[in-house]
């Protein structure tokens, strides 16, 4: 990288704090949803008498949904915008989370799990993108920890 001429101040890379705080809040929400969602739903299913095999099969839907959602996130965000895609993912995650509470039919928890974890994966990918876009390269290590 070339050095600026002597006497010329080096460019200052500013961090846009409101955007960075929002992006970190988003990734924090993703961490809470994954960290609490997987074990809590398994405990609820166990309390309802669901076999451990079916609980494991239902939990596997999270991984499948995550792989599928990660594959389509960039294209979706490109077509509809990052903010709109994130808002849709938040809406889908919230509706499916409520579905776990109100829907007692175990078999309907499979599509709920796919929607919930697919939406959470979209939020994860776009939050990471947002953090990387907001933090200047020279400070990215500081921001990401």
Regions found by a protein language model. Give the residues of each.
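Helix-loop boundary and gating motifs at the non-cytosolic
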Residues: 14-63
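Core transmembrane helices of Major Facilitator Superfamily
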Residues: 34, 115-127
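Intracellular juxtamembrane helix-capping segments at the cytosolic ends
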Residues: 41, 122-135
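Helix-to-loop junctions at the C-terminal end of transmembrane segments
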Residues: 69-81
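Helix-breaking motifs and short loop linkers at transmembrane-helix boundaries and internal kinks
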Residues: 81, 102-107
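Structural signature of the two symmetry-related core transmembrane helices
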Residues: 84-99
């Amino acid at each position: 990288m070339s050095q600026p001429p002597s006497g010329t101040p080096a460019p200052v890379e500013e961090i846009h704090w409101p955007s960075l705080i929002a992006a970190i809040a988003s990734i924090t929400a993703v961490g809470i949803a994954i960290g609490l969602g997987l074990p809590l739903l398994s405990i609820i299913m166990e309390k309802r008498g669901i076999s451990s095999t079916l609980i494991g099969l239902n939990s596997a839907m999270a991984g499948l949904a995550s792989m599928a959602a990660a594959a389509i996130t960039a294209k979706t965000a490109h077509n509809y915008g990052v903010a709109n895609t994130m808002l849709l993912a938040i809406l889908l995650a919230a509706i499916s989370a409520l579905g776990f509470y109100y829907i007692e039919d175990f078999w309907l928890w499979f599509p709920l799990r796919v929607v919930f974890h697919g939406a959470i994966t979209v939020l994860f990918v776009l939050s990471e993108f947002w953090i990387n876009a907001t933090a200047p390269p020279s400070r990215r290590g500081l921001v990401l920890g």
